[in-house]
Amino acid sequence: METVEGIMVVTTETIPGYRIVEVKGIARGGIVKATHIGRDIMAVLRNIKGGEVREYTQMMAEAREEALRRMALHAKELGANAVVNVRFATSNVGSSVAEVYAYGTAVVVEKEE
């Protein structure tokens, strides 16, 4: 189990050892991220050669982490202490611009006795 901004975050429907006592709603967080010219130049060069475009891999990893953080902050605003069923969605917004969206069910959980 991962904790982000003090919120338990899991991709499963339940958290082992905890029970859901209240559902607060959908927690969501998104970011639209663009590359900068330096990354684009390196990406073009790597694309010619083939293989992984590390500049874009790094950019998307950073975007996923920020989307997850924003989702956790939204869950806090909803009064939750956990988010279950966490999922990610991505889409291209434009050339070298991508949206990453994290969402899940914000819940209040209590430790099982």
Curated annotation (Swiss-Prot):
Taxonomic superkingdom: Archaea
Family membership noted in the UniProt record: Belongs to the UPF0145 family.
Name of the protein in its database record: UPF0145 protein TK1926
Originating species: Thermococcus kodakarensis (strain ATCC BAA-918 / JCM 12380 / KOD1)
